[in-house]
A protein has these predicted regions:
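Ligand-site clamp/hinge motif
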Residues: 211-256
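Surface-exposed binding/hinge segments that line
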Residues: 92, 98, 102, 135-178, ...
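Extracytoplasmic/peripheral linker and loop segments enriched in polar/acidic and small residues
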Residues: 387-389, 419-484
Length: 507
């Protein structure tokens, strides 16, 4: 599933300022290509974003705790998005709204206290009653109670066939009682993972040490030294100069300055999509939508804007979901073959919106304008910061809108995204789209438990959406991860939940 290593053209000198900005950042770093030299087996990590909420697991900061292997959840997900044992060894559905989880024995928290069912119930209850509600529980009415020392029953107001997958979200990490003693949840010395979070330096960095009493395999590295480095040039310099062992999200523009053997492309569950307003304006006509679809040259956008470091979209769901392509069978194509023929569009005026927060989107808009105008459309662009354009986009103020959209949310399942964007009652329906057949397909998929039947139903719903040209998927994004030559076992995870694990080393 890992994309091939990128090919760089040359090694260029990077900014001296960027190099100086990283000097001294990592306690274990050294110059050259082997930052963990001289017997130092700690891993130095340069991350893109600093914590925004004090590393509370009830926020998106939870994903940092997960990527450091400091906090763990009841279950994990495999490549197909199916639940696997973690802090829970088994689970069963005792009624449509009740699931019982058996808790792993012999697990200790980092503060030395043993894991018991009451700890699980406490953590899940804290998440369920938090304000604001963690994203994974948005719209979910859930309670958790310990049945005894080793089992916990989770109850939902309505049937939730994906509850085990939901339990895999880092926002539902299980922490020791000590984490909940203050006004905010404090993960320091409170997780169960192979690394102990021992210190956090505000928005600058964090320190983790090997947890010798981990219930699984003892960590290969003695610790992790984390620095938060928002500047992309500085992150790239950290890898090139050997200041960091592992680097998140290297900008495409910096890849040419780094040894090609140190950079890896990871497919992301994110699709750059052109949403068409199906309710009003020119694109209310399906034949005009078909004309827009036929006008778009996806490969040119990938090669021009993304320098080839993205995947041409074959559907709404991309390579980050490895099962999706195999599900697009003859029945899928039969549905797509029902799309109308394109109408002539000479002189048809359309408004095209996007935002500047993702630097590539205005460039995509320029490419799209050229392609659409070559087909006969007259395009008027409207590009703003996202905070100033989102409300207009949701209200249907544009004929077309470009969005880089996450297709898999916290449960590892794309149904929530498809419903939000394409159901009649969808909360993020930029296409102003409503079709009974699509709603029926989405409801069928949502009702099925995780597994082959649900995956087939998801792709069937995708076909119904694309057959109506409610949106035109253009490309699937990749993220570029940097790893020093000495690094082994760093995880290249499309879900961005795992990065440094007990198997990671930098020797």
């Amino acid at each position: 599933m890992i994309a091939p290593r990128t090919r760089t053209l040359s090694l260029l000198a990077v900014s001296t300022i960027s190099c100086l900005a990283l000097t001294g950042c990592f306690s274990s770093g050294s110059s050259g290509s082997t930052p963990a030299a001289d017997g130092d087996d700690r891993v130095s990590l340069a991350m893109l974003q600093p914590p925004r909420s004090g590393l509370t697991p009830l926020s998106d900061d939870a994903f940092k705790l997960s990527r450091w292997s400091a906090a763990e959840t009841l279950v994990s997900l495999d490549d197909l998005g199916e639940a696997q044992a973690s802090l829970a060894t088994s689970w069963e559905q005792s009624s449509p709204t009740e699931w019982t989880f058996t808790i792993r024995e012999g697990v200790s928290f980092h503060d030395g206290t043993p894991l018991a069912a009451e700890d699980v119930a406490r953590s899940l209850t804290a998440a369920a009653t938090a304000s604001p509600t963690p994203r994974i529980l948005d719209g979910v009415d859930m309670t958790a109670a310990a049945d005894n020392d080793t089992t916990v029953t989770v109850t939902t107001a309505v049937a939730d066939p994906l509850l085990p997958q939901r339990m895999s979200s880092p926002q539902l990490s299980i922490l020791a009682a000590s984490a909940y003693e203050g006004d905010t949840v404090d993960p320091i010395n409170a997780g169960t993972g192979p690394f102990v979070l021992t210190a956090v330096d505000g928005t600058s960095g964090a320190t983790l040490d090997r947890f010798k009493d981990y219930w699984g395999e003892t960590a290969a590295a003695s610790g992790i030294d984390v620095q938060f480095v928002p500047d992309g040039t500085a992150r790239a310099a950290a890898l090139r100069t050997g200041t960091a062992d592992v680097v998140e999200a290297i900008p495409v523009s910096q890849v040419a300055q780094i040894d090609e053997d140190l950079v890896f492309e990871v497919p992301m569950p994110r699709t750059n999509t052109l949403y068409l307003n199906t309710d009003s304006g020119p694109f209310a006509d399906p034949a005009v939508r078909a004309a827009a679809r036929e006008a778009i040259d996806r490969a040119t956008i990938v090669s021009g804007v993304y320098e080839g470091r993205a995947d041409v979209a074959e559907g709404l769901l991309g390579p980050a979901l490895p099962w999706a392509a195999d599900e697009r069978d003859n029945d899928y194509q039969t549905v797509l073959d029902q799309r109308p023929e394109a109408a002539p569009v000479d002189g048809v005026r359309i408004s095209l919106g996007t935002f500047t927060d993702r630097a590539e989107l205005p460039e995509v808009a320029v490419q799209l304008e050229q392609q659409l105008e070559a087909a006969g459309f007259i395009v008027e662009q409207d590009v703003r910061e996202y905070q100033y354009i989102e409300a207009d986009a949701v209200d249907g103020a544009f004929d077309a809108f470009i969005l880089s959209r996450a297709t898999v949310l916290d449960s590892g399942d794309p149904v929530a995204y498809l419903y939000s964007d394409f159901a009649c009652e969808g909360s993020f329906n930029l296409s102003q789209f409503c079709d009974p057949a699509v709603d029926e397909a989405l409801e069928e998929a949502a009702a099925l438990p995780a597994g082959p039947e649900r995956r087939s139903a998801i792709i069937a719903a995708e076909a119904e959406i694309l057959a109506r040209d409610a949106a035109i998927p253009m490309l699937h994004e990749r993220v570029i991860q940097g790893e020093a030559a000495s690094v082994e076992g760093a995880v290249r995870d499309p879900r961005e939940r795992a990065l440094i694990t007990e198997e990671t080393s930098a020797r």
